[in-house]
Curated annotation (Swiss-Prot):
Belongs to the cytochrome P450 family. The keyword Flavoprotein does not apply. Its cofactor is heme. The lineage of its organism: Eukaryota, Fungi, Dikarya, Basidiomycota, Agaricomycotina. Heme binds at C487. InterPro entries: Cyt_P450, Cyt_P450_E_grp-I, Cyt_P450_sf, Cytochrome_P450_monoxygenase. This is Cytochrome P450 monooxygenase 219.
Length: 546
Protein backbone atom coordinates (compact mmCIF):
# COMPACT_ATOMS: atom_id res chain seq x y z
CA UNK A 1 0.00 0.00 0.00
CA UNK A 2 2.81 2.38 0.95
CA UNK A 3 4.52 1.61 -2.36
CA UNK A 4 1.33 2.46 -4.26
CA UNK A 5 0.97 5.77 -2.42
CA UNK A 6 4.60 6.66 -3.17
CA UNK A 7 4.02 5.79 -6.83
CA UNK A 8 0.88 7.94 -6.99
CA UNK A 9 2.67 10.88 -5.36
CA UNK A 10 5.52 10.41 -7.80
CA UNK A 11 3.18 10.45 -10.79
CA UNK A 12 1.41 13.51 -9.39
CA UNK A 13 4.72 15.31 -8.90
CA UNK A 14 5.89 14.37 -12.40
CA UNK A 15 2.60 15.56 -13.91
CA UNK A 16 2.78 18.83 -12.00
CA UNK A 17 6.36 19.50 -13.13
CA UNK A 18 5.47 18.62 -16.75
CA UNK A 19 2.41 20.93 -16.68
CA UNK A 20 4.37 23.82 -15.13
CA UNK A 21 7.18 23.43 -17.67
CA UNK A 22 4.71 23.26 -20.57
CA UNK A 23 2.84 26.35 -19.38
CA UNK A 24 6.15 28.15 -18.91
CA UNK A 25 7.23 27.10 -22.39
CA UNK A 26 3.94 28.25 -23.94
CA UNK A 27 4.14 31.50 -21.98
CA UNK A 28 7.63 32.14 -23.37
CA UNK A 29 6.47 31.30 -26.90
CA UNK A 30 3.46 33.62 -26.70
CA UNK A 31 5.63 36.35 -25.19
CA UNK A 32 7.97 36.15 -28.20
CA UNK A 33 5.03 36.15 -30.62
CA UNK A 34 3.50 39.21 -28.94
CA UNK A 35 6.84 40.96 -29.42
CA UNK A 36 6.93 40.38 -33.20
CA UNK A 37 5.96 43.46 -35.27
CA UNK A 38 2.69 43.44 -37.17
CA UNK A 39 -0.17 45.62 -38.40
CA UNK A 40 -2.64 46.94 -35.82
CA UNK A 41 -5.87 45.06 -35.27
CA UNK A 42 -9.18 46.91 -35.44
CA UNK A 43 -10.84 44.58 -32.99
CA UNK A 44 -9.81 41.99 -30.39
CA UNK A 45 -13.00 40.12 -31.21
CA UNK A 46 -12.44 39.91 -34.99
CA UNK A 47 -8.69 40.47 -35.27
CA UNK A 48 -7.21 41.55 -38.60
CA UNK A 49 -6.75 38.21 -40.38
CA UNK A 50 -9.90 38.65 -42.48
CA UNK A 51 -8.36 41.82 -43.90
CA UNK A 52 -5.79 39.43 -45.40
CA UNK A 53 -8.27 36.80 -46.57
CA UNK A 54 -10.95 39.13 -47.91
CA UNK A 55 -11.63 39.66 -51.61
CA UNK A 56 -10.23 43.20 -51.48
CA UNK A 57 -7.25 42.27 -49.32
CA UNK A 58 -4.43 42.95 -51.81
CA UNK A 59 -3.43 46.28 -50.23
CA UNK A 60 -3.36 44.71 -46.78
CA UNK A 61 -1.38 41.73 -48.08
CA UNK A 62 1.17 44.09 -49.60
CA UNK A 63 1.41 46.05 -46.34
CA UNK A 64 2.04 42.84 -44.39
CA UNK A 65 4.66 41.60 -46.85
CA UNK A 66 6.62 44.83 -47.16
CA UNK A 67 6.48 46.83 -43.94
CA UNK A 68 7.01 44.57 -40.93
CA UNK A 69 9.88 42.24 -41.75
CA UNK A 70 10.23 38.55 -42.69
CA UNK A 71 8.09 37.36 -39.76
CA UNK A 72 4.89 39.28 -39.05
CA UNK A 73 2.34 38.92 -36.27
CA UNK A 74 -1.28 38.91 -37.38
CA UNK A 75 -4.31 38.51 -35.15
CA UNK A 76 -7.20 36.12 -35.50
CA UNK A 77 -10.57 36.22 -33.74
CA UNK A 78 -10.51 36.48 -29.93
CA UNK A 79 -6.87 37.58 -29.90
CA UNK A 80 -5.52 34.41 -31.54
CA UNK A 81 -1.93 34.92 -32.74
CA UNK A 82 -1.12 34.12 -36.38
CA UNK A 83 2.27 34.39 -38.08
CA UNK A 84 3.07 35.51 -41.63
CA UNK A 85 6.43 34.01 -42.59
CA UNK A 86 8.60 34.92 -45.59
CA UNK A 87 12.06 34.37 -44.04
CA UNK A 88 13.93 31.81 -46.25
CA UNK A 89 15.33 29.72 -43.39
CA UNK A 90 12.00 29.60 -41.59
CA UNK A 91 10.24 28.67 -44.84
CA UNK A 92 12.77 25.89 -45.40
CA UNK A 93 11.92 24.49 -41.97
CA UNK A 94 8.18 24.62 -42.70
CA UNK A 95 8.23 23.40 -46.30
CA UNK A 96 11.19 20.98 -46.36
CA UNK A 97 12.92 20.14 -43.10
CA UNK A 98 9.85 19.61 -40.92
CA UNK A 99 7.12 19.27 -43.53
CA UNK A 100 5.60 16.37 -41.60
CA UNK A 101 5.14 18.70 -38.62
CA UNK A 102 3.79 21.74 -40.49
CA UNK A 103 0.64 20.59 -42.28
CA UNK A 104 -2.46 22.13 -43.81
CA UNK A 105 -5.17 23.18 -41.35
CA UNK A 106 -7.95 20.68 -40.80
CA UNK A 107 -10.47 23.08 -42.37
CA UNK A 108 -8.39 23.21 -45.59
CA UNK A 109 -8.07 19.43 -45.85
CA UNK A 110 -11.80 19.00 -45.26
CA UNK A 111 -12.57 21.65 -47.90
CA UNK A 112 -10.45 19.85 -50.51
CA UNK A 113 -12.09 16.52 -49.71
CA UNK A 114 -15.58 18.01 -49.92
CA UNK A 115 -14.78 19.71 -53.24
CA UNK A 116 -12.89 16.91 -54.99
CA UNK A 117 -13.01 13.75 -52.89
CA UNK A 118 -10.03 11.90 -51.39
CA UNK A 119 -7.44 13.66 -53.57
CA UNK A 120 -3.73 14.50 -53.46
CA UNK A 121 -4.03 17.94 -51.84
CA UNK A 122 -6.55 16.72 -49.28
CA UNK A 123 -4.41 13.86 -47.99
CA UNK A 124 -1.55 13.52 -45.52
CA UNK A 125 1.11 10.99 -44.60
CA UNK A 126 1.13 7.58 -46.29
CA UNK A 127 -2.05 8.32 -48.22
CA UNK A 128 -0.44 11.41 -49.76
CA UNK A 129 2.82 9.54 -50.48
CA UNK A 130 0.99 6.75 -52.32
CA UNK A 131 -1.03 9.18 -54.45
CA UNK A 132 1.96 11.34 -55.32
CA UNK A 133 4.09 8.30 -56.21
CA UNK A 134 1.57 7.31 -58.85
CA UNK A 135 1.11 10.87 -60.17
CA UNK A 136 4.75 12.01 -60.36
CA UNK A 137 5.76 10.22 -63.61
CA UNK A 138 2.92 11.70 -65.69
CA UNK A 139 4.09 15.24 -64.88
CA UNK A 140 7.70 14.60 -65.87
CA UNK A 141 9.51 16.66 -68.50
CA UNK A 142 9.63 13.60 -70.75
CA UNK A 143 5.84 13.33 -70.74
CA UNK A 144 5.52 17.09 -71.39
CA UNK A 145 7.58 16.62 -74.57
CA UNK A 146 5.08 14.04 -75.83
CA UNK A 147 2.14 16.36 -75.14
CA UNK A 148 3.55 19.48 -76.84
CA UNK A 149 2.00 18.81 -80.31
CA UNK A 150 -1.44 18.41 -78.72
CA UNK A 151 -0.98 21.72 -76.88
CA UNK A 152 -0.23 23.50 -80.15
CA UNK A 153 -3.24 21.93 -81.89
CA UNK A 154 -5.58 23.23 -79.19
CA UNK A 155 -4.10 26.74 -79.18
CA UNK A 156 -4.23 26.92 -82.98
CA UNK A 157 -8.02 26.60 -82.57
CA UNK A 158 -7.92 29.47 -80.10
CA UNK A 159 -5.93 31.53 -82.62
CA UNK A 160 -8.51 30.88 -85.34
CA UNK A 161 -11.52 31.88 -83.26
CA UNK A 162 -9.83 35.11 -82.12
CA UNK A 163 -8.69 35.78 -85.70
CA UNK A 164 -12.29 35.48 -86.89
CA UNK A 165 -13.35 38.06 -84.32
CA UNK A 166 -10.72 40.70 -85.18
CA UNK A 167 -10.15 40.12 -88.89
CA UNK A 168 -12.37 43.10 -89.66
CA UNK A 169 -10.54 45.39 -87.25
CA UNK A 170 -9.66 45.91 -83.60
CA UNK A 171 -12.13 44.49 -81.11
CA UNK A 172 -12.51 44.23 -77.35
CA UNK A 173 -12.21 40.62 -76.21
CA UNK A 174 -12.45 39.12 -72.73
CA UNK A 175 -9.11 37.31 -72.74
CA UNK A 176 -9.90 35.65 -69.40
CA UNK A 177 -12.84 33.84 -71.00
CA UNK A 178 -10.66 32.48 -73.79
CA UNK A 179 -7.61 31.60 -71.70
CA UNK A 180 -10.02 29.78 -69.38
CA UNK A 181 -11.66 27.87 -72.20
CA UNK A 182 -8.27 26.98 -73.68
CA UNK A 183 -6.94 25.86 -70.29
CA UNK A 184 -9.99 23.64 -69.75
CA UNK A 185 -9.57 22.04 -73.18
CA UNK A 186 -5.84 21.49 -72.61
CA UNK A 187 -6.34 19.72 -69.29
CA UNK A 188 -9.30 17.91 -70.84
CA UNK A 189 -7.29 16.48 -73.73
CA UNK A 190 -3.90 16.26 -72.01
CA UNK A 191 -5.16 15.29 -68.58
CA UNK A 192 -8.32 13.27 -69.11
CA UNK A 193 -8.28 12.37 -72.81
CA UNK A 194 -11.59 14.20 -73.16
CA UNK A 195 -12.70 17.26 -75.14
CA UNK A 196 -14.64 19.77 -73.04
CA UNK A 197 -14.79 22.65 -75.51
CA UNK A 198 -14.38 22.75 -79.32
CA UNK A 199 -13.18 26.37 -78.99
CA UNK A 200 -15.58 27.87 -81.47
CA UNK A 201 -17.05 31.29 -81.26
CA UNK A 202 -20.68 30.60 -80.41
CA UNK A 203 -21.36 30.35 -76.71
CA UNK A 204 -23.75 27.44 -77.17
CA UNK A 205 -20.73 25.23 -77.81
CA UNK A 206 -19.23 26.05 -74.42
CA UNK A 207 -19.15 23.41 -71.74
CA UNK A 208 -21.02 23.98 -68.47
CA UNK A 209 -17.97 22.61 -66.69
CA UNK A 210 -15.92 25.71 -67.52
CA UNK A 211 -18.64 28.12 -66.44
CA UNK A 212 -19.05 26.23 -63.18
CA UNK A 213 -15.32 26.34 -62.46
CA UNK A 214 -15.15 30.10 -63.00
CA UNK A 215 -17.98 30.63 -60.52
CA UNK A 216 -16.31 28.57 -57.80
CA UNK A 217 -13.51 30.90 -56.63
CA UNK A 218 -15.65 33.99 -55.94
CA UNK A 219 -18.26 31.80 -54.24
CA UNK A 220 -15.68 30.13 -51.98
CA UNK A 221 -14.32 33.51 -50.86
CA UNK A 222 -17.84 34.61 -49.95
CA UNK A 223 -18.29 31.66 -47.58
CA UNK A 224 -14.84 31.84 -45.96
CA UNK A 225 -16.34 32.22 -42.49
CA UNK A 226 -18.36 29.03 -42.98
CA UNK A 227 -15.26 27.19 -44.18
CA UNK A 228 -13.52 27.87 -40.89
CA UNK A 229 -16.14 25.86 -38.99
CA UNK A 230 -16.19 22.94 -41.43
CA UNK A 231 -14.39 20.62 -38.98
CA UNK A 232 -17.46 20.92 -36.76
CA UNK A 233 -20.08 20.86 -39.53
CA UNK A 234 -18.83 17.60 -41.06
CA UNK A 235 -19.45 15.84 -37.75
CA UNK A 236 -23.12 16.80 -37.65
CA UNK A 237 -25.17 13.70 -38.37
CA UNK A 238 -24.87 11.17 -41.21
CA UNK A 239 -23.86 12.05 -44.77
CA UNK A 240 -27.44 12.12 -46.08
CA UNK A 241 -28.39 14.65 -43.39
CA UNK A 242 -25.47 16.95 -44.26
CA UNK A 243 -26.41 16.76 -47.93
CA UNK A 244 -30.02 17.66 -47.15
CA UNK A 245 -28.87 20.57 -45.00
CA UNK A 246 -26.69 21.80 -47.88
CA UNK A 247 -29.55 21.49 -50.37
CA UNK A 248 -31.83 23.74 -48.32
CA UNK A 249 -29.17 26.13 -46.97
CA UNK A 250 -30.42 29.67 -47.81
CA UNK A 251 -27.21 31.09 -49.26
CA UNK A 252 -26.59 31.64 -52.99
CA UNK A 253 -22.82 31.18 -52.68
CA UNK A 254 -23.22 27.83 -50.90
CA UNK A 255 -25.58 26.71 -53.65
CA UNK A 256 -23.08 27.81 -56.31
CA UNK A 257 -20.32 25.75 -54.71
CA UNK A 258 -22.68 22.77 -54.40
CA UNK A 259 -23.56 23.04 -58.12
CA UNK A 260 -19.88 23.18 -59.11
CA UNK A 261 -18.98 20.18 -56.95
CA UNK A 262 -21.90 18.16 -58.34
CA UNK A 263 -20.95 19.09 -61.91
CA UNK A 264 -17.29 18.14 -61.42
CA UNK A 265 -18.10 14.88 -59.66
CA UNK A 266 -20.68 13.77 -62.23
CA UNK A 267 -18.46 14.53 -65.21
CA UNK A 268 -15.35 12.97 -63.64
CA UNK A 269 -17.23 9.75 -62.91
CA UNK A 270 -18.59 9.60 -66.47
CA UNK A 271 -15.14 10.09 -68.00
CA UNK A 272 -13.58 7.56 -65.63
CA UNK A 273 -16.13 4.91 -66.60
CA UNK A 274 -15.50 5.58 -70.31
CA UNK A 275 -11.73 5.33 -69.93
CA UNK A 276 -11.92 2.20 -67.83
CA UNK A 277 -14.19 0.54 -70.40
CA UNK A 278 -11.87 1.54 -73.25
CA UNK A 279 -8.84 0.08 -71.49
CA UNK A 280 -10.71 -3.18 -70.95
CA UNK A 281 -11.70 -3.29 -74.63
CA UNK A 282 -8.10 -3.09 -75.79
CA UNK A 283 -5.71 -0.78 -77.63
CA UNK A 284 -8.01 0.07 -80.55
CA UNK A 285 -10.70 1.45 -78.24
CA UNK A 286 -8.11 3.52 -76.38
CA UNK A 287 -6.71 4.96 -79.61
CA UNK A 288 -10.19 6.09 -80.65
CA UNK A 289 -10.39 8.35 -77.59
CA UNK A 290 -9.31 11.99 -77.71
CA UNK A 291 -5.96 11.51 -75.98
CA UNK A 292 -5.17 8.27 -77.85
CA UNK A 293 -4.18 6.74 -74.53
CA UNK A 294 -1.37 9.26 -73.95
CA UNK A 295 -3.32 11.49 -71.58
CA UNK A 296 -2.54 11.62 -67.87
CA UNK A 297 -5.53 9.59 -66.68
CA UNK A 298 -5.06 6.77 -69.22
CA UNK A 299 -1.46 6.41 -68.11
CA UNK A 300 -2.52 6.57 -64.46
CA UNK A 301 -5.14 3.87 -64.98
CA UNK A 302 -2.59 1.55 -66.56
CA UNK A 303 -0.02 2.33 -63.85
CA UNK A 304 -2.57 1.78 -61.12
CA UNK A 305 -3.58 -1.57 -62.59
CA UNK A 306 0.08 -2.66 -62.58
CA UNK A 307 0.84 -1.27 -59.11
CA UNK A 308 1.35 -3.45 -56.07
CA UNK A 309 -1.55 -3.79 -53.65
CA UNK A 310 0.27 -1.45 -51.23
CA UNK A 311 0.53 1.31 -53.85
CA UNK A 312 -2.75 0.80 -55.69
CA UNK A 313 -5.34 3.59 -55.43
CA UNK A 314 -9.06 2.85 -55.05
CA UNK A 315 -11.35 4.09 -57.83
CA UNK A 316 -12.74 6.84 -55.61
CA UNK A 317 -9.27 8.38 -55.33
CA UNK A 318 -8.70 8.09 -59.09
CA UNK A 319 -11.95 9.99 -59.73
CA UNK A 320 -10.97 12.57 -57.11
CA UNK A 321 -7.65 13.20 -58.91
CA UNK A 322 -9.59 13.94 -62.10
CA UNK A 323 -11.71 16.64 -60.47
CA UNK A 324 -8.64 18.10 -58.79
CA UNK A 325 -6.61 18.11 -62.02
CA UNK A 326 -9.29 20.00 -63.93
CA UNK A 327 -9.85 22.59 -61.22
CA UNK A 328 -6.16 23.17 -60.45
CA UNK A 329 -5.09 23.33 -64.09
CA UNK A 330 -7.88 25.61 -65.27
CA UNK A 331 -8.05 28.68 -63.06
CA UNK A 332 -4.43 29.04 -61.92
CA UNK A 333 -2.94 28.93 -65.41
CA UNK A 334 -5.70 30.78 -67.24
CA UNK A 335 -5.75 33.62 -64.71
CA UNK A 336 -1.95 33.90 -64.84
CA UNK A 337 -2.05 33.96 -68.64
CA UNK A 338 -4.66 36.71 -68.59
CA UNK A 339 -2.46 38.64 -66.17
CA UNK A 340 0.54 38.26 -68.48
CA UNK A 341 -1.48 39.57 -71.43
CA UNK A 342 -2.59 42.53 -69.32
CA UNK A 343 1.03 43.29 -68.38
CA UNK A 344 2.15 43.00 -72.00
CA UNK A 345 -0.64 45.41 -72.95
CA UNK A 346 0.61 47.83 -70.29
CA UNK A 347 4.25 47.42 -71.40
CA UNK A 348 4.04 47.62 -75.19
CA UNK A 349 7.83 47.70 -75.53
CA UNK A 350 8.13 44.30 -73.84
CA UNK A 351 5.27 42.98 -75.98
CA UNK A 352 7.08 44.10 -79.14
CA UNK A 353 10.39 42.55 -78.08
CA UNK A 354 8.67 39.30 -77.14
CA UNK A 355 6.88 39.17 -80.50
CA UNK A 356 10.19 39.68 -82.28
CA UNK A 357 11.75 36.77 -80.37
CA UNK A 358 8.77 34.52 -81.08
CA UNK A 359 8.66 35.34 -84.81
CA UNK A 360 12.40 34.82 -85.23
CA UNK A 361 12.27 31.45 -83.48
CA UNK A 362 9.09 30.28 -85.19
CA UNK A 363 7.67 29.31 -81.80
CA UNK A 364 4.20 30.45 -82.83
CA UNK A 365 4.06 27.97 -85.71
CA UNK A 366 4.47 24.80 -83.68
CA UNK A 367 7.76 23.93 -85.37
CA UNK A 368 9.66 24.29 -82.11
CA UNK A 369 10.77 21.46 -79.85
CA UNK A 370 9.95 21.42 -76.15
CA UNK A 371 13.53 22.25 -75.21
CA UNK A 372 13.74 25.11 -77.72
CA UNK A 373 10.46 26.57 -76.47
CA UNK A 374 11.53 26.37 -72.83
CA UNK A 375 14.85 28.11 -73.56
CA UNK A 376 13.49 31.20 -75.34
CA UNK A 377 14.99 33.83 -73.00
CA UNK A 378 12.44 36.66 -73.06
CA UNK A 379 9.43 34.32 -73.12
CA UNK A 380 10.88 32.56 -70.09
CA UNK A 381 11.62 35.87 -68.39
CA UNK A 382 8.07 37.18 -68.91
CA UNK A 383 6.59 34.03 -67.36
CA UNK A 384 9.00 33.97 -64.41
CA UNK A 385 8.62 37.65 -63.64
CA UNK A 386 4.83 37.48 -63.68
CA UNK A 387 4.84 34.46 -61.39
CA UNK A 388 7.25 36.32 -59.10
CA UNK A 389 5.38 39.62 -58.74
CA UNK A 390 1.86 38.27 -59.22
CA UNK A 391 1.65 34.76 -57.72
CA UNK A 392 -1.87 33.47 -58.42
CA UNK A 393 -2.37 31.81 -55.02
CA UNK A 394 -1.39 33.53 -51.75
CA UNK A 395 -3.84 32.06 -49.24
CA UNK A 396 -1.61 29.19 -48.09
CA UNK A 397 -1.53 28.20 -44.42
CA UNK A 398 0.36 25.62 -42.35
CA UNK A 399 -0.18 24.51 -38.74
CA UNK A 400 2.46 22.76 -36.56
CA UNK A 401 1.22 19.50 -35.05
CA UNK A 402 3.59 19.97 -32.10
CA UNK A 403 5.52 22.80 -30.42
CA UNK A 404 8.25 23.89 -32.83
CA UNK A 405 10.94 26.50 -33.38
CA UNK A 406 11.46 28.51 -36.57
CA UNK A 407 15.10 29.57 -37.11
CA UNK A 408 15.57 32.88 -38.95
CA UNK A 409 18.03 33.84 -41.68
CA UNK A 410 18.34 37.29 -40.15
CA UNK A 411 17.30 38.38 -36.63
CA UNK A 412 14.06 40.31 -36.19
CA UNK A 413 13.94 43.40 -33.97
CA UNK A 414 11.08 42.98 -31.50
CA UNK A 415 8.65 45.70 -30.52
CA UNK A 416 10.61 46.21 -27.30
CA UNK A 417 13.92 46.46 -29.17
CA UNK A 418 15.17 42.97 -28.32
CA UNK A 419 16.75 40.79 -31.01
CA UNK A 420 14.76 37.68 -31.98
CA UNK A 421 16.95 34.99 -33.58
CA UNK A 422 14.33 32.25 -33.71
CA UNK A 423 10.61 32.04 -33.10
CA UNK A 424 9.05 29.39 -30.83
CA UNK A 425 5.73 28.31 -32.34
CA UNK A 426 3.17 26.54 -30.11
CA UNK A 427 1.27 23.58 -31.48
CA UNK A 428 -1.76 24.67 -33.51
CA UNK A 429 -0.47 28.15 -34.41
CA UNK A 430 -1.62 29.21 -37.88
CA UNK A 431 1.25 30.22 -40.19
CA UNK A 432 0.53 32.04 -43.44
CA UNK A 433 3.16 31.13 -46.05
CA UNK A 434 4.60 34.43 -47.27
CA UNK A 435 4.64 33.63 -50.98
CA UNK A 436 4.41 37.26 -52.08
CA UNK A 437 6.70 38.48 -49.28
CA UNK A 438 9.42 36.04 -50.29
CA UNK A 439 9.03 36.79 -54.01
CA UNK A 440 9.43 40.57 -53.55
CA UNK A 441 11.88 40.61 -50.64
CA UNK A 442 13.98 43.73 -51.32
CA UNK A 443 16.94 42.40 -49.34
CA UNK A 444 17.12 39.57 -51.88
CA UNK A 445 15.75 40.96 -55.14
CA UNK A 446 16.85 44.59 -54.78
CA UNK A 447 15.07 47.90 -54.35
CA UNK A 448 13.12 47.37 -57.58
CA UNK A 449 11.69 44.06 -56.31
CA UNK A 450 8.08 45.28 -56.66
CA UNK A 451 8.52 46.30 -60.30
CA UNK A 452 7.57 43.98 -63.15
CA UNK A 453 10.89 43.85 -65.04
CA UNK A 454 11.32 40.69 -67.14
CA UNK A 455 14.81 41.82 -68.10
CA UNK A 456 16.06 40.98 -64.59
CA UNK A 457 15.99 37.30 -65.66
CA UNK A 458 18.16 37.96 -68.73
CA UNK A 459 21.28 38.41 -66.59
CA UNK A 460 22.49 36.60 -63.46
CA UNK A 461 20.18 37.02 -60.47
CA UNK A 462 21.48 38.88 -57.39
CA UNK A 463 23.84 36.74 -55.35
CA UNK A 464 21.58 37.19 -52.33
CA UNK A 465 18.79 35.32 -54.13
CA UNK A 466 20.96 32.30 -54.90
CA UNK A 467 22.52 32.30 -51.42
CA UNK A 468 19.16 32.45 -49.64
CA UNK A 469 18.27 28.81 -50.42
CA UNK A 470 14.61 29.68 -50.98
CA UNK A 471 12.77 26.34 -50.76
CA UNK A 472 10.59 26.88 -53.85
CA UNK A 473 10.50 24.22 -56.55
CA UNK A 474 10.61 26.86 -59.34
CA UNK A 475 13.16 29.62 -60.02
CA UNK A 476 13.91 30.70 -56.42
CA UNK A 477 10.22 31.54 -56.06
CA UNK A 478 7.62 30.35 -53.57
CA UNK A 479 4.85 30.54 -56.18
CA UNK A 480 4.61 26.75 -56.62
CA UNK A 481 5.79 26.01 -53.06
CA UNK A 482 8.37 23.27 -52.52
CA UNK A 483 9.01 19.95 -50.86
CA UNK A 484 6.68 16.97 -51.10
CA UNK A 485 3.62 19.22 -51.29
CA UNK A 486 4.90 21.42 -54.11
CA UNK A 487 2.56 21.94 -57.06
CA UNK A 488 2.88 18.68 -58.97
CA UNK A 489 1.72 20.19 -62.27
CA UNK A 490 3.95 23.26 -62.52
CA UNK A 491 5.72 21.93 -65.65
CA UNK A 492 2.33 21.40 -67.32
CA UNK A 493 1.35 24.96 -66.40
CA UNK A 494 4.66 26.40 -67.62
CA UNK A 495 4.37 24.69 -71.00
CA UNK A 496 0.76 25.82 -71.38
CA UNK A 497 1.64 29.46 -70.68
CA UNK A 498 4.49 29.41 -73.18
CA UNK A 499 2.52 27.76 -75.98
CA UNK A 500 -0.40 30.18 -75.58
CA UNK A 501 1.89 33.21 -75.53
CA UNK A 502 3.98 31.92 -78.45
CA UNK A 503 0.94 31.53 -80.68
CA UNK A 504 -1.16 34.50 -79.57
CA UNK A 505 1.55 37.18 -79.26
CA UNK A 506 2.96 36.13 -82.66
CA UNK A 507 -0.40 36.85 -84.27
CA UNK A 508 -2.09 39.59 -82.25
CA UNK A 509 -1.43 42.94 -80.57
CA UNK A 510 -2.97 43.51 -77.14
CA UNK A 511 -3.88 46.90 -75.63
CA UNK A 512 -5.51 47.86 -72.33
CA UNK A 513 -8.20 50.53 -72.02
CA UNK A 514 -10.22 49.63 -68.92
CA UNK A 515 -8.96 49.60 -65.36
CA UNK A 516 -8.65 46.06 -64.03
CA UNK A 517 -9.10 45.09 -60.38
CA UNK A 518 -7.45 41.88 -59.16
CA UNK A 519 -9.37 40.18 -56.37
CA UNK A 520 -8.01 37.90 -53.65
CA UNK A 521 -9.30 34.31 -53.70
CA UNK A 522 -7.95 30.77 -53.64
CA UNK A 523 -6.68 31.83 -57.06
CA UNK A 524 -6.72 35.61 -57.63
CA UNK A 525 -9.10 36.72 -60.38
CA UNK A 526 -9.75 39.98 -62.30
CA UNK A 527 -12.87 42.12 -62.60
CA UNK A 528 -13.47 45.37 -64.46
CA UNK A 529 -14.78 47.25 -61.45
CA UNK A 530 -13.90 47.08 -57.76
CA UNK A 531 -17.02 45.15 -56.80
CA UNK A 532 -17.68 43.42 -60.11
CA UNK A 533 -19.51 40.11 -59.90
CA UNK A 534 -18.13 38.51 -63.06
CA UNK A 535 -14.46 37.53 -63.49
CA UNK A 536 -13.27 39.12 -66.74
CA UNK A 537 -10.32 40.88 -68.35
CA UNK A 538 -11.23 42.77 -71.54
CA UNK A 539 -8.38 43.85 -73.83
CA UNK A 540 -8.36 45.55 -77.22
CA UNK A 541 -7.07 42.98 -79.73
CA UNK A 542 -6.02 43.42 -83.34
CA UNK A 543 -4.17 41.32 -85.91
CA UNK A 544 -0.42 41.89 -85.95
CA UNK A 545 0.81 43.09 -89.34
CA UNK A 546 4.55 43.09 -89.93
Amino acid sequence: MATLIVLLYGLLAFGTVWLVRRQSKNHDAHRVMRNIPGPPSRSWMKGNIMQYFTRHGRAFQRDVALNYGPVVRLQGPLGRKILYVSDPKALHTIIIKEENVFEEPESTLITFNLLFGDCLVGSLGENHRRQRKLLNPVFSVNHMRHMLPMFYNVIFKLREVVMAKVRGGEKEIDVLEWTGRAALELIGQGGLGYSFDPLVSDKEARNEYGDALKAMLPALMNIESLRQILPHLVKMGPKWFRRLATDIFPNAHVQTVKHVVDTMSKRSQEIFREKKAALKSGDEAVLRQVGEGKDIMSILLRANTAASDADKLPESQMVAQMSLLVFAATDTTSNTLAHILQLLAEHSNVQSKLREELLQSGAGTGNTSYDELMKLPLLDAVCRETLRVHPPATLLVRVPRKDSILPLSEPVIGLDGTIIKDVPVPEGTEIVIGVFGSNVNKSLWGEDALEWKPERWLSPLPRAVNDASIPGVYSNLMTFLGGKRACIGFKFSEMEMKVVLAVMVSNFVFELEKEIEWNVAGVDYPTVVWDGDRPQLPLKVRVYKS
